[in-house]
């Protein structure tokens, strides 16, 4: 039994006469599953692919997606169009741009690194850039690799105040356990996890911090 787009009850065939329905569908040879999720997509990554993405999602049973990083204007427009045409697009949840430090990784430097992020190179920019995303009603936030520990902790504080979940990569300036303890709700990929599970993880982190402080050395 489906009510308002949700499967609310499953009964035996012999009991179908007990269920009142405005419409019945013969399911012989068919099957029914809940809508699938794609929890990691980037509408902004490929301009040529983007026009076909919604139709491809629906054709494969994907009815909800998380856009995990892209220019705020672009992903907001994608979400708005999905809301306006719910039968032609999945439910779209957006993070806005990756919240990165300096230099930001996805900075439009090449086709492999399109502009998916916002750089935070000033002490106050984390507050202003994060507040902009909050004001534009993003569904969650995504932390990225080049954030300093101080920037990361400030991002977590702001997210907690707003009740927003934060997903992302483990910043190069931190280890996995510190990032999770600070409030990270999810990990996208397993990048940077290997250092935290090494037997000499403290030494490796110290070496990495030295490289981050002196990138040209």
Which residues does each predicted region cover?
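Histidine-rich, glycine-flanked metal-binding segment
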Residues: 1-33
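Divalent-metal coordination cores built from histidine and acidic residues
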Residues: 27, 31, 36-39, 53-171, ...
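Short pre-active-site segment immediately N-terminal to the catalytic Zn-binding motif
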Residues: 47-52
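Short active-site segment of divalent metal-dependent hydrolases/proteases
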Residues: 43-45
């Amino acid at each position: 039994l489906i009510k308002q787009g949700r499967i609310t009850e499953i009964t035996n065939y012999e009991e179908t006469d007990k269920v009142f329905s405005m419409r019945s569908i013969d399911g012989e040879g068919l099957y029914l599953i809940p809508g699938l999720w794609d929890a990691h997509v980037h509408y902004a990554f490929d301009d040529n692919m983007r026009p076909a993405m919604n139709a491809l999602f629906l054709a494969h049973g994907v009815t909800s997606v998380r856009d995990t990083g892209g220019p705020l204007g672009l992903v907001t427009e994608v979400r708005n169009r999905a809301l306006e045409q719910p039968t032609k697009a999945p439910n779209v949840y957006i993070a806005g741009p990756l919240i990165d430090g300096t230099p930001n990784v996805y900075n439009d430097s090449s086709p492999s690194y399109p502009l998916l992020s916002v750089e935070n190179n000033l002490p106050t920019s984390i507050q202003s850039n994060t507040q902009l995303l909050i004001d534009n009603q993003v569904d969650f936030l995504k932390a990225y690799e080049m954030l300093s520990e101080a920037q990361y902790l400030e991002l977590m504080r702001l997210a907690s105040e707003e009740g927003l979940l934060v997903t992302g990569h483990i910043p190069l300036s931190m280890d996995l356990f510190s990032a999770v303890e600070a409030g990270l709700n999810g990990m996208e990929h397993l990048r940077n996890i290997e250092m935290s599970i090494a037997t000499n993880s403290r030494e490796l982190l110290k070496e990495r911090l030295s490289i981050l402080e002196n990138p040209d050395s």
